[in-house]
UniProtKB/Swiss-Prot annotation:
S-S pairs: C127-C153, C141-C168
Renumbered residue ranges of the record's region Disordered: 20-91, 768-794
UniProt biased composition (Pro residues): 771-794
Region span, Interaction with SYVN1: 643-723
Modification after translation (UniProt): N-glycosylated.
Protein name as annotated: Protein sel-1 homolog 1
Length: 794
């Protein structure tokens, strides 16, 4: 009977062994390993500590000491019956035919891991050698079962049973890991200081931390420091050092590094300019997900710079960026950025740039402290959104709104509701508190509070969802012209929430909200035009709207950083920042970069490259409709700055500025070119016509136009004398017909000018003081090396 039982058990063991072998063959052929026997993904080890010791393997010795057996093995062996042991020996013999069952068991017991100074996984756990995986024994770390080739080991004998494992690492890998852990700690410390303070001294200290982390090859620290060196942000500007860091980042596959290197090749900063290389790096940066690279490529396809113009390609890039910008828009609306054009500020010093003077801010603060509610609300809004020379500060905004709300101001209550609904480091998020303030403001008829209450009912924030009440409050807010109410009404009609879907109504309210400058209204309109929803599909309209949204992204804050650098006299830092923004398609950055180059204030660009680069950016700004840039293009071709003298091209640019933007300066220049016959056939009558048009277009042009007409009268008189018969001149000469009914006034003006010139000349001789030259009525040239070929008389 025992023989039959033994044979039966042996037969079962053989069958079991063959089944196991066949399953091994099938599992080897299949690419995916069974979940019970395959290694988990990398994500499964994220909870492990990363403060372990170095591992390179284990040292094994032959040992017959039974005390080194693991408790698990002792428990298993003690629980086995003699019959089970014999079956196990038979099975082991079948699985390992090269060893006898006895020798195999002895070898398995003898080979025990011995803890040494070098041990364990990257998580500080000892490797167990040998260990079983897929019914195979491994005496060292292996990459089996992993697609990425990383080495691993089991930390218990049977991986299939316990599934305890870890990655192995070499001494070098462990040193790198510890270094990166230290670098990460330093980086986080620097970022905490950088984000938690507005003081320049503390920000410089933060960058010292970041520089140290960058020296340890921390990728994010390298990106921060390299851009700081490029722009001169709290570090001394160093283009060469920035370039080296960008190259290092590019080798590591950093999209930010690739985008920045593309910018350097475009602008020729630290490298020889190469549009082809720039396009390659921009493309790689965009493929890596860098939003600035997408903006650059979108603008290049829009303007046809280095690539063929393609509306659909522009739409692809701009839509991707706009999606991110729209998703970042908070309930409070985000920060506000002023777009200040340096040429306008210089030509019109009295023009309001939108920036508040420090004295005026202090005056408002004084009024707020004295209890002026309007000053409190105004300062609260300034600090909530930032802009106009005031830094964003939620703590101050909250304090000012609290003061005004306690005084019963409904607007302050509504904005407190917004701050509580959004939540921040200063104001904890609380739907109940937000709802309280929204209700109080809405009961007082405040549109901001009504819109906030509508949002609460629409999304169920602190109250049960009620689409009818949401629609009611949005309508009340929209009737008072509040853009948030108009936007939400449009969204409800667009999506059919609480109302019947109506794209015409959605389009109506989105248009109203866009007129108030709401970013999400532009975004929704762009989506409708891009997909042809409710309107005729228009790629060009969608692109213009998406471009508007993209330019409201967080990177637009650098416009103010560049402006502040310019005001501080750091022209090199300002021009580099404007040049990068110009690559992204910002017209104001293009004109400001061209202006700085035109004034030769930036030494970072070589003298031979100054005017050609300025001409390039004037051209790009003009293509986006900036009048001054169009006139500057005419001036550059008129005087030959950065290009050859070309009167015909200059005439074309002046005419475009005259016809499209009704520029008085362009009309005056056209009159002068008609008078002199430059780039066009000489025509005194057309010259007078353009002079008159310039005087009508701008009151500031009346004086130079009057002087130009006086000169034109003399020119016409001399021309008439040359063409007329000298003997008939006195019989045919009619001064009224020749110079107009006010010819005597012209004559007196000429005499007065001559007399003034003589007096000024005599005074200069006596005082030895040069007389300042009066401004000429012709195109004002930039500073130049030598006199132009064709210079109008003073």
């Amino acid at each position: 009977m025992q023989v039959h039982v033994g044979l039966t058990l042996l037969l079962c063991a053989v069958l079991l062994s063959s089944a196991t072998a066949s399953s091994d063959d099938e599992s080897n052929q299949d690419e995916s390993i069974d979940s019970k026997s395959s290694l988990p993904a990398d994500e499964s080890v994220k909870d492990h500590s990363t403060t372990g010791r170095v591992v390179a393997g284990q040292i094994f010795v032959d040992s017959e000491d039974p005390e080194v057996e693991s408790p698990l093995q002792e428990e298993e062996e003690s629980s086995k019956t003699e019959e089970e042991v014999s079956v196990g020996e038979e099975i082991s013999f079948v699985e390992s035919p090269s060893l006898s069952s006895k020798s195999y068991e002895e070898a398995k017991r003898a080979r025990k891991p011995v803890l040494t100074a070098i041990e364990g996984t990257a998580h500080g756990e000892p490797c167990h050698f040998p260990f079983l995986f897929l019914d195979k024994e491994y005496d060292e770390c292996t990459s089996d079962g992993r697609q990425d080739g990383r080495l691993w080991c089991a930390t218990t004998y049977d991986y299939k049973t316990d599934e305890k494992w870890g990655f192995c690492e070499t001494e070098e890998d462990a040193a790198k890991r510890r270094q990166m852990q230290e670098a990460e700690m330093i980086y986080q410390a620097g970022m905490k200081i950088l984000n938690g303070s507005n003081r320049k001294s503390q920000k410089r200290e933060a960058y010292r931390y970041l520089q140290k982390a960058a020296g340890m090859n921390h990728t994010k620290a390298l990106e921060r420091v390299s851009y700081a060196l490029l722009f001169g942000d709290y570090l001394t500007q160093n283009i060469q050092a920035a370039k080296e860091m960008f190259e290092k980042l590019t080798e590591e596959g950093s999209p930010k590094g690739q985008t920045a290197l593309g910018f350097l090749y475009v602008s020729g900063l630290g490298v020889n300019s190469s549009q082809a290389k720039a396009l390659v790096y921009y493309t790689f940066g965009a493929l890596g997900g860098n939003l600035i690279a997408h903006m650059v490529l979108g603008y290049r396809y829009w303007a046809g710079i280095g690539v063929l113009q393609s509306c659909e390609s522009v739409l692809t890039h701009y839509r991707l960026v706009a999606n991110h910008v729209a998703s970042d828009i908070s309930l409070t609306g985000g920060s506000v950025v002023q777009r200040i054009r340096l040429p306008d500020e210089v030509e019109n010093p009295g023009m309001n740039s939108g920036m508040l003077e420090e004295d005026l801010i202090q005056y408002y603060q004084f009024l707020a402290e004295k209890g002026d509610v309007q000053a409190q609300v105004g300062l609260g809004q300034l600090h909530l959104h930032g802009g106009r020379g005031v830094e964003q500060n939620h703590q101050r905004a909250f304090d000012y709104f609290n003061l005004a709300a306690n005084a019963g101001n409904s607007h302050a209550m509504a904005f407190l509701g917004k701050m509580y609904s959004e939540g921040s480091d200063i104001v904890p998020q609380s739907n109940e508190t937000a709802l309280h303030y929204f209700k109080k403001a809405a009961d007082m008829g405040n549109p901001v509070g009504q819109s906030g209450l509508g949002m609460a009912y629409l999304y169920g924030r602190g109250i049960q969802v009620n689409y009818d009440l949401a629609l009611k409050y949005f309508q009340k807010a929209a009737e008072q012209g509040w853009v948030d109410g108009q936007l939400q009404l449009g969204s409800m009609y667009y999506n059919g929430i609480g109302v019947k879907r109506d794209y015409k109504q959605a389009l109506k309210y989105f248009n109203l909200a866009s007129q108030g400058g709401h970013i999400l209204a532009f975004y929704n309109l762009a989506q409708m035009h891009a997909s042809g929803t409710g309107v005729m599909r228009s790629c060009h309209t969608a692109v213009e709207l998406f471009k508007n949204v993209c330019e409201r992204g967080r990177w637009s804050e650098r416009l103010m950083t560049a402006y502040n650098s310019y005001k501080d006299g750091d022209y090199n830092a300002a021009v580099v920042q404007y040049l990068l923004l110009a690559e992204q398609g910002y017209e104001v950055a293009q004109s400001n970069a061209a202006f700085i180059l035109d004034q030769r204030e930036a030494t970072i660009v070589g003298e031979n490259e100054t005017y050609p680069r300025a001409l390039l950016h004037w051209n790009r700004a003009a293509s986006q409709g900036y009048t001054v840039a169009r006139i500057k293009l005419g001036d550059y071709h008129f005087y030959g700055f950065g290009t050859d003298v070309d009167y015909e091209t200059a005439f074309i640019h002046y005419r475009l500025a005259s016809e499209q933007q009704h520029s008085a300066q362009a009309m005056f220049n056209l009159g002068y070119m008609h008078e002199k016959g430059l780039g066009i056939k000489q025509d005194i009558h057309l010259a007078k016509r353009f002079y008159d048009m310039a005087a009508e277009a701008s009151p500031d042009a009346q004086v130079p136009v009057f002087l130009a007409l006086c000169k034109l009268g003399v020119v016409y008189f001399l021309q008439y004398i040359r063409e007329a018969n000298i003997r008939d001149i006195f019989t045919q000469l009619d001064m009224d017909q020749l110079l107009g009914p006010e010819w005597d006034l012209y004559l007196m003006t000429i005499i007065a000018l001559l007399l003034g010139t003589v007096i000024a000349y005599r005074q200069r001789q006596h005082q030895d003081v040069p007389v300042p030259r009066p401004p000429g009525p012709w195109p004002a040239p930039p500073q130049q090396e030598g006199p132009p070929e064709q210079q109008p008389p003073q």
